[in-house]
Design a protein with these regions (language model features):
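Conserved N-terminal subdomain of the carbohydrate kinase-like
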Residues: 7-9, 18-29, 44-124, 138-146
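A short, aliphatic-rich alpha-helical micro-motif
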Residues: 116-117, 167, 192
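Conserved phosphate-binding/catalytic region of the ribokinase-like
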Residues: 4-7, 190-279
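HhH-family (HhH-GPD) DNA N-glycosylase catalytic core used in base-excision repair
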Residues: 280-599
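Active-site metal-binding loops of divalent metal-dependent hydrolases
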Residues: 14-16, 34, 234
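Short beta-strand scaffold segments in enzyme catalytic cores
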Residues: 40, 85-88, 206-210
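Conserved beta-alpha-beta core of the PfkB/ribokinase-like small-molecule kinase fold
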Residues: 122-189, 204-207
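Alpha-helix C-terminal capping segments
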Residues: 39-48, 242-245
Length: 599
């Protein structure tokens, strides 16, 4: 989903192997090993991969195709010294290791690892000796490398305490549901420190991504499984490559699930040795993109004077140079969601409330209330102040002229504030230090977004609406707090105004009449219904941005200004809309009505 400025690099510490597989009444000899599957999957997903492991000389024919795709570094060994595994897959889903020969795996040395530099990514496979894996993970992490690790059930049973230390040393930890149960007790108890991520693969049930304490479930494509070997490692390599490229972990996991599903339809790593691009994440075909309409709307935005980036200055915003500016925007943007009222399972009206003698709507109200908050108690907007904020205190700071907090999402707001503050404190970050860390990267925007993927109030949304909005604000303010690297731009900022515009313009088309009827009736939708619309709108806006050639900040401001031209409660003012000649005028459609803290 992200735009690559260069191919990400992944180091894989772990040896390929030569295996004997038993499945569905068949016995097959195959190239294998976690290092091989992980490396090939990452390479196919766009990464440059270096595998660190003893290298056989001569190269066995079974490994020759993989060797051509990977940068395999390590001391020479005879082929018979490679690890060997004999694995049986039982009809009930269990895996039995009949034989495991460690071979040269124990000969991997840290000195063989090339200098990757801070910010690089590495994966340490689940070595037969978890202490060896732990040593690699710790040393790589100390060198500033983003480290992923995996495990295997027998290793957890025999060395649970060591594997838990591996979890602590990992930025990204991969396991299956059985292993998660052995480590944490159950899937629902999986938790790690802020800034850490656990991926739990669940076979046909998909995967769970846990960002610190926040779980996000991912569906898996349905396929006819032939050989399950390497599914978890394929997932791992794809996910790490996509995270290194800039994707949110949950979006990376969707692509990883699609690649893992394809891998199990063949024997061994065959699906990873093709030149075709990796499979796309499944799309809900109830909502489709209209390519012709997208092209026409992109043409309008390319030349429309209304498509200009907003600088986020004015009466509701801090003056340039105000010392509270960063805290105002970091804490305030996390609260930019849910400005609408519901009654009897349907959308009732947008939120409008009096403040300073003026009736202000939704986002405008929030910014004005936060401006007052910054004047009254600026220390409360710092991470430390947000972390300890009580519900009553939040209500008092957001009070309208009648003395009440009018925000319709209720307790979601103070909970969001505390999540933001607590994660920032746990990570040792302030808004200024987070920006400094991003600025030190050769891809500042990508690093900025990945840091927010660790912070409450932002991390929960795979589509990064609030993260992208904050990036746009900080780059467009007069202070230019955030710079972008070459070819970097913010991802689509898809809120409910944007979705309403996309539906009515016709850049996305609802092919399912039942869903279209629910949208038109403004009914509260299920999560699956909402996701179908929002994901399609995200893709449509990304394509409008690509075709139109305008910065995403300008594209976003065009869509946001459409909230007045094509509003929620009154007839659209089509003559005032620059996109009117390209519009499908599907004005009966309405944005997904779905209560979320994402937008």
């Amino acid at each position: 989903m992200s735009r690559l400025t260069s191919r990400p690099r992944l180091l894989v510490v772990g040896s390929p192997s030569l295996d004997l597989l038993h499945f569905k009444g068949r016995s097959v000899r195959s190239a294998g090993g976690a290092g091989l599957y992980t490396g090939l999957a990452a390479q196919r997903a766009g990464a440059e991969v270096t595998v660190v492991a003893p290298r056989p000389d001569p190269m066995p024919p079974a490994l020759a195709a993989a060797d051509r795709r990977l940068d395999w570094r390590g001391p020479s060994i005879p082929p018979e010294a490679l690890p060997h595994f004999e694995i049986e897959y039982l009809p009930d889903g269990r895996t039995v290791y009949r034989r495991a020969v460690r071979g040269s795996e124990g000969d991997i040395r840290y000195g063989d690892v090339p200098d990757a530099g801070p910010g690089a990514f590495a994966y340490v496979v689940p070595l037969l000796d978890p202490e060896l894996q732990l040593g690699f993970a710790r040393r790589l992490s100390e060198a500033g490398v983003r480290v992923g690790c995996g495990t295997y059930a027998p290793g957890v049973r025999q060395h649970r305490d060591v594997v838990l230390r591996v979890v602590e040393a990992s930025h990204y930890f991969f396991c299956n549901a059985e292993e998660a149960g052995l480590l944490w007790g159950s899937l629902d108890e999986v938790r790690v420190a802020p800034g850490r991520v656990v991926f739990v693969t669940r076979g046909a049930q998909g995967a769970r991504v846990v960002l610190g304490d926040r779980p996000i479930d991912i569906a898996a494509p349905r396929v006819d499984e032939l050989d399950p070997t390497g599914a978890g490692d394929t997932f791992c390599g794809t996910a790490l490559a996509r995270i290194a490229a800039g994707d949110h972990p949950a979006i990376a996991a969707r692509g990883a699930a699609a690649c893992a599903a394809q891998t199990v339809t063949g024997v061994g790593p065959a699906a990873l040795l093709v030149d075709d691009p990796p499979p796309l994440s499944p799309r809900d075909d109830r909502v489709r993109l209209d390519s012709d309409r997208i092209r026409r709307v992109a043409g309008v935005i390319a030349s429309a004077p209304e498509a200009t980036a907003f600088d986020f200055t004015g009466p509701a915003f801090p003056e340039p140079g105000d010392p509270a500016t960063l805290d105002y925007f970091f804490a305030g943007t996390a609260q930019q969601f849910g400005f609408w009222l519901e009654r009897d399972g349907r959308y009732e009206a947008p939120m409008v409330a009096p403040l300073g003698g003026r009736a202000l709507k939704g986002s405008d109200y929030l910014w004005a209330a936060f401006r007052r908050w910054a004047a009254e108690a600026p220390d409360q907007l710092t991470p430390a102040g947000q972390a300890t904020l009580g519900d009553a205190d939040f209500d008092r700071r957001l009070r309208d002229d009648d003395g009440r907090n009018p925000l319709p999402a209720g307790p979601l707001h103070p909970a969001c504030a505390r999540g933001y503050g607590r994660d920032m404190l746990a990570l040792g970050l302030t808004p200024a230090s987070l920006l400094a860390e991003a600025d030190a990267s050769d891809r500042p925007l990508a690093r900025f977004l990945s840091l927010l993927d660790c912070v409450g109030g932002y991390k929960e949304d795979p589509w990064r609406k609030k993260s992208a909005l904050l990036a746009a604000i900080l780059s467009q303010r007069p202070e230019r707090f955030l710079r972008f690297g070459d070819a970097e731009d913010v991802p689509p900022i898809v809120d409910y105004h944007c979705q309403r515009s996309c539906l009515r313009l016709g850049v996305v088309a609802v092919a399912d009449e039942a869903l279209a009827s629910r949208l038109a009736a403004r009914e509260v939708l299920s999560g699956d219904d909402e996701e179908a619309v929002r994901a399609a709108c995200w893709e449509a806006v990304a394509e409008i941005h690509r075709l139109g050639g305008r910065p995403m900040g300008a594209v976003d401001w065009f869509f946001f200004q459409n909230r007045t031209r094509c509003p929620e409660m009154s007839k659209p003012d089509c003559p005032a809309c620059p996109a009117d000649p390209a519009c499908a005028h599907r004005t009966r459609l309405f944005q997904p009505v779905f209560r979320t803290a994402a937008y």
